[in-house]
């Protein structure tokens, strides 16, 4: 699902409820124990669904936003400025090759205090100037998010390492998430919280960058 329709975002909350219930059923977590969620994303739909699920009461600690080299979301969480004025990079995780993250608007609306006028102004700035900046007050509401990205080289190394360690081949999008999770652990020291890494793309369904150039 790559739609920006609100109904699709709402449906995706079930992924995280199911994952939490599965962990609890298998005895991996205790009742009400918080987990982290790592989501590889460009359009912000799946991680927004996790955010909604958290706000509805699902025990989620950190929402870890994983980007590829089109790291507009990482830069947003790092600086508070969303800026699409940059080169577009074709990567091996093409479903994340996005510079205008359409579902982020819904998060902006929430942290703007459900202020439609303020939200509209920022989206108009994005349309005309290619960027907008949120206020410090709005940034403070993003404390539950962590953002980072992986390069193409790092993504390939993650796939290789996981295959050598487990015999399991992950797709490039999931590898981005796994690589970012490693960075999260190093940056925060949080190695104890149980963590779900969302796999949002099938291994054999996405075209390579070369395929995209030829299409």
Where are the predicted features?
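Catalytic phosphate/nucleotide-handling subdomain of diverse soluble enzymes
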Residues: 61, 68, 179-206, 210
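General beta-strand structural signal in soluble alpha/beta enzymes
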Residues: 11, 39, 65-66, 168-172, ...
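Single conserved hydrophobic/aromatic residue that forms the stacking wall/gate
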Residues: 1-6, 10, 204-215
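A glycine-rich, Thr/Ser-enriched phosphate-binding loop motif common to dinucleotide/cofactor-binding enzymes
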Residues: 7-14, 99
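Glycine-rich phosphate/pyrophosphate-binding loop at beta-loop-alpha junctions
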Residues: 28-31, 36-125, 200-206
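Active-site-adjacent helical/loop segments in soluble small-molecule enzymes
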Residues: 11-26, 31-34, 110-188
